[in-house]
């Protein structure tokens, strides 16, 4: 009994402190929210005072939704590497000196959300040329989403093969599998004797042609510089853009620097990252849920 009482009291103290932090910095009470993303989203709207235009055109919405593909959890095809340099006990001077380095991007989500982002005036364009789009600066007041066909020439395959740009959610075909993959598939039973298997869409970086690929104009400029060819443009969406989210991101970043305990350090990081997740939310999965103890309401709903 004493344990339960202590546990409840400690948790209540922690939650009350959490409420004080939120109300002090954001003027919002987390007790009114079901999740951290919904709290963070309202905090962002309150602090930035931004008015975001909603997309009402179904075709436009589907094109924008197609740009949400997920994230890769690997870079390159090498599964094993071994360093060999003068700082190692097992250094072999007769072999090539090399190093293994671990890279991590600081404030990855925060940096992305501090860039110019769409916020109003989304519309389909018919008079904007590809050259105009490719010559649009990153900080221009107008930005673009482009639906296009892409081709990766053979001469750039060697350069890009370890980390191909523009991954796609596609069904992998059996003929793409290596002999090793086929062997493992047969052993595990995922590939049957008649060489049929249950394919599910995967996020795959590849250097084959991309059809109807929807991409942000800054990424399009980047891959064009890598040597990727833009074969056809199907649709162009223009929008007004500015770094409207940067104020909120910078606020949390500064508060995290000033934090004197682990809770606040993690809290201000979460308040940034949770907003990113909220921008990726699939609202099509939402449902209206009613709780009632009234028979008439139950029949009505």
Task: Give the location of each predicted region.
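Conserved acidic
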Residues: 1-301
